[in-house]
From Swiss-Prot:
Record's keyword terms, sorted: ATP-binding, Kinase, Nucleotide biosynthesis, Nucleotide-binding, Transferase
EC category name: transferase
Sequence similarity: Belongs to the thymidylate kinase family.
Lineage: Bacteria, Pseudomonadati, Campylobacterota, Epsilonproteobacteria, Campylobacterales
Naturally occurring in which organism (per UniProt): Campylobacter concisus (strain 13826)
Protein name per its UniProtKB record: Thymidylate kinase
Function recorded in the entry: Phosphorylation of dTMP to form dTDP in both de novo and salvage pathways of dTTP synthesis.
Pfam families given in the database record: Thymidylate_kin
Keyword Transcription regulation listed: no
Residue positions binding ATP: G7, I8, D9, G10, V11, G12, K13, S14
UniProt gene name: tmk
Enzyme Commission designation: 2.7.4.9
C-alpha cells in the first residue's frame, strides 16, 4: 500500500511516519524530494542552493524527481507498505502557490505521467492553525528557501493542498495537527486498517 503523508513543514508528518515505521519493520520509508540519489541532488539545488531557478523549471525538476522516485523506489515495492513524506499533492499545491496562472488539471496530468498513472492508495493530510505553524517553525529555528517565503505563503499552500484533495476525491484522512501524537497515531492506524 502506497501512503502519502501530506502537509506543510512542521505539522507532524515525520513524527507519525517514524511511529508507523517502528510498528511495521518491513515498511519502506521515503520522501519527496530526496528519496533517490537524483532526488537528494535536486533537493539540494531546489531548497538550499543559491542557483536561481524559474518557476516552470522548478516544477519540472520536482516532476523529474517524482518520476525517478516512482520508478526506482515505489513501483518495485508496491506489494509492501510505502510511507512517503510528501508527494504529488505537495508538488501541485506549491506550484499553484508560486504561479496562480498555472492550470491545476495540467499539473495533475503531468504528475499522473510522472507516476505512471499510479496515484497513492491513501493520503494522510495534516492541517494546522496559523498559530501552531508559526510556533513550530520558530521552534525549529532553521528554514529552507520555501519556508523562508513566510507564514502566509505556507498557509496558502496548505489551503491549496486541502482544496486539491477534496476536489479530486482522493482517499484521504484529514488530521488536525493540534491533536496529541498518540491520538493522531491511532487515527492513522485505523485509516490504514492495520490492527
Amino acid at each position: 500500500m502506497y501512503v502519502l503523508f501530506e502537509g506543510i513543514d512542521g505539522v507532524g508528518k515525520s513524527t507519525q511516519i517514524e511511529i508507523l515505521a517502528s510498528k511495521f519493520s518491513d515498511a519502506i520509508v521515503t520522501k519527496e524530494p530526496g528519496g533517490t540519489q537524483l532526488g537528494v541532488n535536486l533537493r539540494e539545488i531546489l531548497l538550499r542552493s543559491s542557483i536561481k531557478i524559474g518557476k516552470r523549471a522548478e516544477i519540472l525538476l520536482f516532476l523529474a524527481d517524482r518520476a525517478e522516485h516512482f520508478e526506482k523506489l515505489v513501483a518495485p515495492n508496491l506489494g509492501k507498505l510505502i510511507l512517503s513524506d510528501r508527494g504529488f499533492i505537495s508538488g501541485i499545491a506549491y506550484a499553484l502557490a508560486n504561479d496562480e496562472n498555472l492550470d491545476e488539471n495540467v499539473l495533475l496530468e503531468l504528475n499522473k505521467f510522472a507516476l505512471n498513472d499510479k496515484f497513492a492508495d491513501k493520503i494522510i493530510f495534516f492541517e494546522a492553525s496559523r498559530e501552531l505553524i508559526s510556533s513550530r517553525l520558530k521552534a525549529r529555528g532553521t528554514s529552507d528557501k520555501i519556508e523562508a517565503r513566510g507564514l502566509e505563503y505556507l498557509l496558502k499552500v496548505q489551503s491549496l493542498m486541502k482544496q486539491i484533495l477534496i476536489k479530486n476525491g482522493f482517499e484521504t484522512l484529514f488530521i488536525d495537527a493540534s491533536k496529541s501524537i498518540e491520538l493522531i497515531s491511532k487515527e492513522i492506524e485505523n485509516f490504514i486498517n492495520f490492527k
